[in-house]
Amino acid sequence: MPRVVCWHTLKSLNGYKNLSSGAETREGLRSSSPVDLPLRPRKQATAAGQRKLLSLQLLLCACTSVTDLTYWGPAGHGATAPHRSLLAIHLHLVPASSAAMKATGPHNAQTQVNPQGHAPSAEDPTGTWTVSGPCKDHPHPFLSQSNPPTRISSALPLKTDSALEQTPQQLPSLHLSQG
């Protein structure tokens, strides 16, 4: 069953050096083909310790779902350490969450949305939806639809397959001299 594991939790429980696999680094090993090494975790964290740290850090960092605690394969020649890969995943997820929080935060000057039934205020005396954008010359197409949807004019006759079969004289005919 998958568990949610955060990089901060792994760092706190296992330490930086214990995030790598049990595979040993062998100096001077040069081979063009990958070497099969047994993978085993260095240290398993207790579930209670994980829950405690996750409850404290859940709001502070983006987490990723993994099936087990950090089983890492052997790194290639010149590759970074496995805990740096996990750190890159963590740092990749955090800006997206920060951007989403800033976009909906109270200090965003571009878009202000008040929920339905909100108490009237100085900015919104009626207490209804208020959406203001940076381009007032070009209103939002979904919020300002003044024209009804375009309808097909009844003056244009629509021909079905049966109507085309009844009027074959209107279809151009090909002669052998044309082809």
UniProtKB/Swiss-Prot annotation:
Stretch list, region Disordered: 100-179
Biased composition (Polar residues): 143-153, 163-179
Presence of keyword Acetylation: yes
GO biological process, one term: protein-containing complex assembly
Tissue expression from the record: Specifically expressed in fetal liver, cord blood and bone marrow. Also expressed in the K562 and HEL cell lines, which constitutively express the fetal globin genes.
Post-translational modification: Acetylation at Lys-43 prolongs the protein half-life by preventing ubiquitin-mediated degradation and reduces the interaction between NF-E4 and HDAC1, potentially maximizing the activating ability of the factor at the gamma-promoter.
Residues with the N6-acetyllysine modification: 43
A Gene Ontology molecular function term of the record: protein homodimerization activity
Keywords noted in UniProt: Acetylation, Activator, Nucleus, Repressor, Transcription, Transcription regulation, Ubl conjugation
A cellular-component GO term for this protein: protein-containing complex
Compartments, record wording: Nucleus
Main localization category: nucleus
Function: Functions as part of the SSP (stage selector protein) complex, a complex that contributes to the preferential expression of the gamma-gene in fetal erythroid cells by facilitating the interaction of the gamma-globin genes with enhancer elements contained in the locus control region (LCR). The complex binds to the stage selector element (SSE) in the proximal gamma-globin promoter. In contrast, isoform 2 acts as a repressor of gamma-globin gene expression by preventing NFE2 and RNA polymerase II recruitment to the promoter.
Record-given protein name: Transcription factor NF-E4
Lineage summary: Eukaryota, Metazoa, Chordata, Craniata, Vertebrata
